[in-house]
Amino acid sequence: MGMRFFGCLCLLVLTASVSAFELDTRVYPADCKTTLRIKAVSAWAQEWLKVATEMKNAGKDKFQKGKEWPLVGYYREDRRYSDSEKYITQIYPEPLDFKLEGNEIVVDVKLTGVNVHSIVFAKLPAARRRFRNFRFIKLLTVDKETFKYRPFKGNVHQHSNVSDGKLDPADHVAFARIGGMDFIGVSDHYAYKQNKSVIDFAAECKSGLTVYPAEEMHTPGAVLHSLSIGATRGHSVHRRTPKFTEAVKPEWDKLIKQFPDCDKDELLSWAETMVLARRAKADGALVVYCHPAWRRRYYINNSFAMIDFVIRSREFHAVEIINGSISRRDNQEAWAVFHEICVETGTKIPVIGSSDSHNVASGAYRRTYTLMFAPDCTFASFKDAVISGRTVASYDLDETAKRPQPMHLGASKYVRYANFLDEAGYWVRHDRITGKQGELIKKYRSGDKTVLPEIDKLAEELKQLRENFFYRSGK
């Protein structure tokens, strides 16, 4: 019991001390042999270097494995059991040979399997059990197919003053960068014209932000909405013409027979949305069922019977399973229905997360987003990532935290990947760069053209972060 407690306590202390050492590259392909050059950055790490140098000079650069902790060790997260025990127990890190070059520790390792790996540093023997004398740095290995992709953060559901939002469409470019977004869509109600100004202004700024044409599609007064992303034109209907009514009627008649007890207006809304979704898909758009469980004061807009039917229909490429502008309760209830359908049918339905922000005061524009794992940020890559299940719906529960702690929903391997990126501080570094860009873009929007070179310089800095954080053969 005491041994297991020691293992848990040590893990907690290690987790709290993650910033003593730095390593630029943190994500690797599985079964990768590499040389790590780890920098000592904190006072503790500098003291560690002093101790390590003294021990090297004295020829005592390792402790005895199994009795004392090594000066530098390796620990793999999936090592839950000892060789002889069938319960969680203390596993000592494997000693590693290392070299000291200036303030860097140079270590050769083989990172086996798909796993989280820890390089552990110790100053004193474990027999003394002084937990403050351990530090570590974590690495991630992913399968070779997943390693081909890079993480990008974006928000494809938000509104401008072209519909019911507060901001001018082009203003979304600055706030997207402040929020750390790599791609966005400004999806106004009944509107497509806003897209050109956003796309043009983003291209003018050259910050690296990618903008997809987007629209929130529905008919007048409809309770069921969907997102069209990447279409060449708008597909919403501003008024129900005889021709449109004729196109909808066959679908409405089917639904009335299938759901005789459902509200007829709700069924009409679904029939109309189905027609719009099919038109947008024919136009090459990615179509998403958005905010399934949203409410208007006292009632839910889509009954749970209808939510269930809509998701099962697979008329949409994906479901917006987290929406930043509706309550946590509504998001949870939508997720519960979604989860039950996936379990019951054995179907993997793609998900996204979006802010649905109408102004910047609420902070929703940066709190809820989609993480995609793709080769780049083009619309073709985004659409493929969503349909292939390489997206995660994310909601940042505590914006005030020094290190993001979002909730991620999606395929398990991408959720684990997303969690590692949070823990490793990737998005902190990423958002620090894009945040500076966003503030400069606001100045540029106000007429200060002198900031463009600095925006471009920051874009190059972001490119370097992406290149360095992920392993490249030969670097």
Locate each region found by the language model.
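Sec-dependent signal peptide recognition
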Residues: G2-L11
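A metal-dependent hydrolase metal-coordination microenvironment
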Residues: E145-C290, E320-G324, R328-V337, S381
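Charged catalytic cores and adjacent phosphate/nucleic-acid-binding surfaces used
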Residues: F21-P151, P169, V173, G221-T232, ...
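Extracellular glycoside hydrolase catalytic/binding regions
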Residues: P292-W294
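N-terminal signal peptide c-region/cleavage motif recognized by signal peptidases
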Residues: T15-S17
